[in-house]
């Protein structure tokens, strides 16, 4: 479960010396560290540090990681995993963000028409627009937010030119 997070908290004297490390379990799995308890010894933890795990019951077993990441690990161009330096491995972990998918001309035209009619959508109208254009409600909501910011910027630039 990608919602499970490991949180390492170093207990220090001042608020500046206090540090916390958060990582996504998918990143740990990608780095080959999910089932390896030795990775903890490589982190900069003192004797007064403690490790807390949120949602321990929801943590998937190690087999689930290897199944889920089998397709991700298929590319042969990733750097080799160094078990002595897990922090460096996290730098090469892949993002879980979806790829950018530009809107079609039809979708953009319909969204622009809707925006000209009304800059703000009700929940019901957002649902309708999303259904008609085969988009998610979240995509429609964010498109409208971005479009309003674009209009604000255009108006600001126009006022500056005058």
Swiss-Prot record:
The domain of life is Eukaryota
Q: Name one GO molecular function term.
A: DNA-binding transcription factor activity, RNA polymerase II-specific
Residue ranges forming the DNA-binding region read 96-155
| Primary location recorded for the protein, binned into one broad class | nucleus
Q: Which InterPro entries does the UniProt entry name for this protein?
A: Abd-B_homeobox_TF, HD, HD_metazoa, Homeobox_CS, Homeodomain-like_sf
Gene3D superfamilies in UniProt: Homeodomain-like
Q: Where is this region: Disordered?
A: 56-91
- Keyword list, A-Z: Cytoplasm, Developmental protein, DNA-binding, Homeobox, Nucleus, Transcription, Transcription regulation
BP-aspect Gene Ontology terms: anterior/posterior pattern specification; embryonic skeletal system morphogenesis; negative regulation of myeloid cell differentiation; proximal/distal pattern formation
In Pfam terms, one family for this protein is Homeodomain
- Give the CC-aspect GO terms: cytoplasm; nucleus
Q: Where in the cell is it found?
A: Nucleus; Cytoplasm
Kindly give the PANTHER family that the UniProt entry links to this protein.
Answer: AGAP004664-PA, HOMEOBOX PROTEIN HOX-A9
The entry's family comment says: Belongs to the Abd-B homeobox family.
Report the protein's function: Sequence-specific transcription factor which is part of a developmental regulatory system that provides cells with specific positional identities on the anterior-posterior axis. Required for induction of SELE/E-selectin and VCAM1 on the endothelial cell surface at sites of inflammation. Positively regulates EIF4E-mediated mRNA nuclear export and also increases the translation efficiency of ODC mRNA in the cytoplasm by competing with factors which repress EIF4E activity such as PRH.
How is this protein organized at the quaternary level?
Answer: Transiently interacts with PRMT5 in TNF-alpha stimulated endothelial cells. Interacts with EIF4E.
Protein name, UniProt field: Homeobox protein Hox-A9
Q: Which organism is it from?
A: Cavia porcellus
Provide the taxonomic classification: Eukaryota, Metazoa, Chordata, Craniata, Vertebrata
Point out the gene that encodes the protein: HOXA9
């Amino acid at each position: 479960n990608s919602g499970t997070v490991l949180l390492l908290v170093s207990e220090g004297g001042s608020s500046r010396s206090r540090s916390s490390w958060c990582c996504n379990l998918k990143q740990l799995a990608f780095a080959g560290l999910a089932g390896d308890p030795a990775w903890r010894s490589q982190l900069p933890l003192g004797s007064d540090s403690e490790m807390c795990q949120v949602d321990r019951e929801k943590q998937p077993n190690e087999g689930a990681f290897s199944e889920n990441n089998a397709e991700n690990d298929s590319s042969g161009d990733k750097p080799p995993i160094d078990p002595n330096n897990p922090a460096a491995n996290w730098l090469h972990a892949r993002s879980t963000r979806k790829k950018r998918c530009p809107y079609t001309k039809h979708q953009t035209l319909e969204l622009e028409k809707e925006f000209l009619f009304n800059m703000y959508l009700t929940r019901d109208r957002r649902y309708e627009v999303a259904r008609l254009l085969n988009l998610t409600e979240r995509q429609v909501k964010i498109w409208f937010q971005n479009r309003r910011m674009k209009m604000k910027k255009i108006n600001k630039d126009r006022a500056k030119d005058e």
